[in-house]
Structures are given as structure tokens and as C-alpha cells.
């Protein structure tokens, strides 16, 4: 795998007499498919009605969640494997490795499952559990990596994939960041479908950008056929893909999955994009929910970003013109995220009134707070405590987690039994290693829900829907640990009193 950033290595220029060096393929759908891979491509184009009511132009959505694996990345997963087979690069029995935000991994794992390849996916921790579950069900091996790791760091999903590639015989990284099959899947497939479905009438097309293969492949074909068509790229705040560079604020994290990067992928040709629009998490998730509720489009969060960008960009179009927006993936991957009302509340993606109303419905705690639980002082460890010593404490007290604190008693992170077991079992850590090697770190740029002694038990109860325990702090110093059993004990005692 070459460095994932840098200019495109493609030397072919469209609209010249030069023959394309690329293999082109586009196969119409069969009435009875030989296998599920035949259901990749040929996705529907749907008119957007309610959400676009303020626009003069027509707005239509390319619904890529109708692909076999649920996203636009099924196209490139299939294309990369087929092209690698035909070139002789891979053969049956080989191992495929791919660093991905999830959807490309699902597309690859789907094709690998049908064709009989072993699949290893390296995946940042922020990606949804649903993606992990689907990948595992398809037979892929999953390795999670720190979300905050820079793309060129050895512990990043790209760095780990490269390391595995160097260690595993007959393994290959098909490399969505630099593989020409990525944009070609859209040049030959997605773009041709759009031109056919729209009968050659497209005035604007809006796509989000991750690796950039989708927007590059579509833009190349569209610009060849419709040179006056406006290509709009959508990039989340915190990513650096947009131009001009002044649009990009790198001192910000984002929860939208599958789009944006901290480097410029090789396959992304930004010169093909006429305009960039930046979006944030809140407006994107709210829009995704609107698309579900008002249009019946069961789409993911990045589709919300794309629609936000489309509604802004399409304001420049007039009556009789048409804007196409690409919706990249389905809600299936985010059932516990933006489809979940409580997740939206916890992350500040809904109006405060909703949260207040939700809290008022939980009258069973009668205004009680964490302080009313009368919790014992916590057992803590330092970052230099050995894994072996930590295990002894976990055994002694029957805990499954221990908070890690600094010399000044500030909370640094948490050691969990599950993470410790994973590291020891996979030999990523040994008993004499310090727990700093295996702990979850609480970083300043990560948003956490503070639990203090004044936190209401209603709020704590909601927190426990997604967490097994909470660290109670005051001024960043740990006061106690509270678990679900503490809350249950309080409820039972309260009922006995009444």
C-alpha cells in the first residue's frame, strides 16, 4: 500500500483521442440474479418533495442504500476485487486487508464472502457497532484502532493494515485511497446510471467526500458529457478535503461516519469539484432524521450532510433545472446512533426543550441525585500500575473496571476488564506492562457526559442505557464509581420505604 495522500497518479485525460487504459464495465441487472453481487448498482433515483419545498429547482436523490450491502461502497468493494482477480494480483486463498470507516469493508467482505477470500478489516473505534456486527457476520476479522490517531501513525487503521500486510503471507491491501478501481466504479457505473435516469439533464450534482472516489468518478464522467454541470462536494467541519483551505477547521472532531479525512486521498481530484460546502454534525443528523420521517428515505448520517449541502447549493438553480444528491448509505448501520432519540439528546443534537420534556417524564426518581446514593470512595490506580497488579485489584474487589488517575487525582482514563483481556489474549500487552498501554484515555477534545454528585438519577438512568458504569467527578477529581446495581439498590430501598 502506497502513501494514501498525494495527487492522483492517473495520467489519462478525458475528452481526448487518447484511449483509456482502464478496464470499463457496466452490466445491466438480471431478472434472476446468479448471486447477491448482481444487485450492486442500478440504484433508484427518487424525487425529494417535502424537504426541498423551498427550492425552485427539482431535487432528486440517488439512493445508494439499495445496493446489496447497503451503501455506495459496495460498488468499489466489488470492482476492486474483480479487477485484482482479472489482473492476476490476487488468487483464491489469499487474504485481503483494508483500512476503512466500515462501508468499504462491508462491500469488500460481501464480495469476499461470495468469492471465498479471507477478509481483515482495520476500523477506527468511533465507527458504529452495527458496522462491526455486519462485518463479523460476513466472516471478516475486525481490528479496532484509536479514532484520534493521525492517518500516518503506526496505530492508525492505515498503519495497522500496513503492518498486517507485511506480516501475513499472500495478503493484499486493495487500498481504496489509491486504487483506480474506486473512481472507475463510479465513472463506469454510478455516473452512467445518472445520465441514463436523468436522460442527460443534470444541472448540479452533490456528493459527500471520503476517499473521494465517488465524487471523482462521477464528476469526470459528468464533466465529459455535461461540461456546464456544477459539481458540489460536501465535507464535515474537522476535515481538510474542501477548497479553498480557509474553509477547513482542523481543531474540531466530528461524529458523522464515512466522510472527511485529515489527509487528501490519492483518488480525490479536487480540481473536478466546482464548489465545497462544509457541514456540522447537528444539522446533518437532524436532516437525516427529516429524510426518514418526511421522505421515507432510510438513510445514514452522511446522507443528512449531503442533503444539507444540496439544499444550500441548489438555491442558485432556477425553475426547470435539476439537482442530483447522492445518499451514500442506510440507517441499518446507525440504529443505536442518530436513529436513537436518547443518543441525539446525549450528544446535544436536539433542542434543549426535548431534553427537558424527556427528563420530566421520569418522575420515579423524585428529584434525587447521585449524592443520594451514598457511594463509597473509589479504588483507583495510576497509569504506571502494572496489568498484573490491576488484575489482582479487579479480582479482590469483584470489579470489571478501575479508574486511572494522575498524582493530583485527576481522572486520566479507565481500565476495563474487557479491554485488558483483549490486549493480553492477543499478546498486544503482557502482565508487566503499565496499564497506560491498555487503558481508555479521556482526551480533552472528546466530548463526555459529566456525572457529578448533583447529576439527577433520571439523567444517570439514561446514561446507563449505553454505559455499564460512570465515574463521578468534581472539578476533574474522582469522587466515586457508580454502577447499575447502585441505582437498582436505591430504587428497591425507596420502594420499601413507600
Curated annotation (Swiss-Prot):
Residues 374-430, 435-497 form the CBS domain. The keyword Amino-acid biosynthesis applies. InterPro entries: CBS_C, CBS_dom, CBS_dom_sf, Cys_Synth/Cystath_Beta-Synth, Cysta_beta_synth, P-phosphate_BS, TrpB-like_PALP, TrpB-like_PALP_sf. Pyridoxal 5'-phosphate binds at residues 103, 210-214, 302. CDD domains: CBS_like, CBS_pair_CBS. The modification N6-(pyridoxal phosphate)lysine is found at residue 73. Residues 11-22 have a biased composition (Low complexity). It comes from the Eukaryota. Its cofactor is pyridoxal 5'-phosphate. PROSITE patterns: CBS, CYS_SYNTHASE. It catalyses: L-homocysteine + L-serine = L,L-cystathionine + H2O. GO terms for biological process: cysteine biosynthetic process from serine; cysteine biosynthetic process via cystathionine; cysteine metabolic process. Its EC number is 4.2.1.22. Belongs to the cysteine synthase/cystathionine beta-synthase family. This is Cystathionine beta-synthase.
Amino acid at each position: 500500500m502506497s502513501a494514501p495522500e498525494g495527487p492522483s497518479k492517473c495520467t489519462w485525460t478525458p475528452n481526448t483521442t487518447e484511449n483509456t487504459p482502464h478496464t470499463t464495465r457496466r452490466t445491466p441487472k438480471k431478472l434472476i440474479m446468479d448471486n447477491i453481487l448482481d444487485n450492486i448498482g442500478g440504484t433508484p433515483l427518487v424525487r425529494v418533495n417535502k424537504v426541498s419545498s423551498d427550492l425552485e429547482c427539482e431535487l432528486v436523490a440517488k439512493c445508494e442504500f439499495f445496493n446489496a450491502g447497503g451503501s455506495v461502497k459496495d460498488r468499489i468493494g466489488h470492482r476492486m476485487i474483480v479487477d485484482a482477480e482479472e489482473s492476476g494480483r490476487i488468487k483464491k486463498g489469499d487474504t485481503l486487508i483494508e483500512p476503512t470507516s466500515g462501508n468499504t469493508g462491508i462491500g469488500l467482505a460481501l464480495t469476499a464472502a461470495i468469492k471465498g477470500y479471507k477478509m481483515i478489516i482495520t476500523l477506527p473505534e468511533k465507527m458504529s457497532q452495527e458496522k462491526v456486527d455486519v462485518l463479523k457476520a460476513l466472516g471478516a476479522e475486525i481490528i479496532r484502532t484509536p479514532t484520534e490517531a493521525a492517518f500516518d501513525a503506526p496505530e492508525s487503521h492505515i498503519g495497522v493494515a500496513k503492518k498486517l500486510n507485511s506480516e501475513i503471507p499472500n495478503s493484499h491491501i486493495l487500498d481504496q485511497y489509491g486504487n483506480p478501481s474506486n473512481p472507475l466504479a463510479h465513472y463506469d457505473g454510478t455516473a452512467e446510471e445518472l445520465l441514463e435516469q436523468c436522460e442527460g439533464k443534470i444541472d448540479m450534482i452533490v456528493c459527500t467526500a471520503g476517499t473521494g472516489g465517488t465524487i471523482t468518478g462521477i464528476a469526470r464522467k459528468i464533466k465529459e458529457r455535461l461540461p456546464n454541470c456544477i459539481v458540489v462536494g460536501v465535507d464535515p467541519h474537522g476535515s481538510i478535503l474542501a477548497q479553498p483551505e480557509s474553509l477547513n477547521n482542523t481543531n474540531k472532531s466530528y461524529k458523522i461516519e464515512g466522510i472527511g479525512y485529515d489527509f487528501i486521498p490519492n483518488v480525490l481530484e479536487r480540481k473536478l469539484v466546482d464548489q465545497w460546502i462544509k457541514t456540522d454534525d447537528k444539522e446533518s443528523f437532524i436532516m437525516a432524521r427529516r429524510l426518514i420521517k418526511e421522505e421515507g428515505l432510510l438513510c445514514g448520517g452522511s446522507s443528512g450532510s449531503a442533503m444539507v449541502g444540496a439544499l444550500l447549493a441548489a438555491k442558485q438553480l432556477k425553475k426547470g433545472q435539476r439537482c442530483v444528491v447522492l445518499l451514500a448509505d442506510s440507517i441499518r448501520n446507525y440504529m443505536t446512533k442518530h436513529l436513537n432519540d436518547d443518543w441525539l439528546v446525549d450528544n446535544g443534537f436536539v433542542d434543549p426543550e426535548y431534553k427537558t420534556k424527556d427528563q420530566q417524564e421520569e418522575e420515579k426518581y423524585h428529584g434525587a441525585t447521585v449524592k443520594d446514593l451514598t457511594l463509597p470512595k473509589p479504588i483507583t490506580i495510576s497509569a504506571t500500575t502494572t496489568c498484573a497488579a490491576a488484575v489482582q485489584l479487579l479480582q479482590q474487589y469483584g470489579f470489571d473496571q478501575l479508574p486511572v488517575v494522575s498524582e493530583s487525582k485527576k481522572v486520566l482514563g479507565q481500565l476495563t476488564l474487557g479491554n485488558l483481556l483483549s490486549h493480553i489474549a492477543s499478546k498486544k500487552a503482557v502482565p508487566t506492562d503499565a496499564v497506560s498501554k491498555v487503558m481508555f484515555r479521556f482526551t480533552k477534545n472528546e466530548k463526555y457526559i459529566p456525572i457529578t454528585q448533583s447529576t439527577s438519577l433520571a439523567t444517570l438512568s439514561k446514561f446507563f442505557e449505553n454505559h455499564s458504569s460512570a465515574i463521578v467527578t468534581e472539578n476533574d477529581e474522582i469522587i466515586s464509581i457508580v454502577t447499575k446495581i447502585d441505582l437498582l439498590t436505591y430504587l428497591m430501598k425507596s420502594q420499601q420505604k413507600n
